[in-house]
């Protein structure tokens, strides 16, 4: 993945990588440390401080997602070319490209040459971002015409609960309802009080007053 340097950075240890503001860095691993990334610049590698860079968008990168999970996700997509890039299970440090085509999900190994450039076939790229952009208009396959396109986010079905008891608000911001009412859950991050909507009103309600239900309204 690509990142843009926001500030100059001068390495102070042998395993760090110096760079200048505006440099385009190739980030190899975002999981080594919460404050440091492993990256490359001009063929040299090392660690860089996370707060000195700004990552370019890469919604197609799913990290260490298993191949089976990638195939399950892409199998639900409607359009050919829906894709993701993941870290290879069989070759740590390498990447795999998973692409939907027809009823199948095809797998492509992302290769790297001696200079650290990425490729699928012949054309080489400085980063995964460049490879992805190129194959949006040039087929990733030599046998079929498959152009990369972003995954469509599947909207989540609303979650509903049903009231077990009447609840009368005691404070401002609470949601009143009657036993049997269906309540759409808007936030269930708190273990005791959830936020919901019912009869055109929104507010907080006690979790132990409701029960889960499968219902589309």
From Swiss-Prot:
Superkingdom of source: Eukaryota
Residue span, SH2 domain: 60-152
Subcellular location: Nucleus; Cytoplasm; Endosome; Golgi apparatus
Keyword Repeat: yes
Domain SH3: 1-58, 156-215
Pfam family, one: SH2
PANTHER family on file: PROTEIN ENHANCER OF SEVENLESS 2B
Role played: Adapter protein that provides a critical link between cell surface growth factor receptors and the Ras signaling pathway.
Family statement: Belongs to the GRB2/sem-5/DRK family.
The protein, known as: Growth factor receptor-bound protein 2
């Amino acid at each position: 993945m690509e990142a843009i340097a926001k500030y100059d950075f001068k390495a102070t240890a042998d395993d760090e990588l110096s760079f200048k503001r505006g440099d385009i860095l190739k980030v190899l691993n975002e999981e080594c440390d919460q404050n440091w990334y492993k990256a490359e610049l001009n063929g040299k590698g090392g660690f860089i401080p996370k707060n000195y860079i700004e990552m370019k968008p890469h919604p197609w990168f799913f990290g260490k997602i298993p191949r089976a999970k990638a195939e399950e996700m892409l199998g639900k997509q409607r359009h050919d070319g829906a894709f993701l890039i993941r870290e290879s299970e069989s070759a740590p440090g390498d990447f795999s490209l998973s692409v939907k085509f027809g009823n199948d999900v095809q797998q492509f190994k992302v290769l790297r040459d001696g200079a650290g450039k990425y490729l699928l076939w012949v054309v080489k790229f400085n980063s995964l971002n460049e490879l992805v952009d190129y194959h949006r208009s040039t087929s990733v396959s030599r046998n079929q015409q498959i152009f990369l396109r972003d995954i469509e986010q599947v909207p989540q079905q609303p979650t509903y609960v049903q009231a077990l008891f009447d609840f009368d608000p005691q404070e401002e911001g609470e949601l009143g309802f009657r036993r049997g009412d269906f309540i759409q859950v808007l936030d269930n991050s708190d273990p005791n009080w959830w936020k919901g909507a019912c009869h055109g009103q929104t507010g907080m309600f006690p979790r132990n007053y409701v029960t889960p239900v499968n219902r589309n309204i």
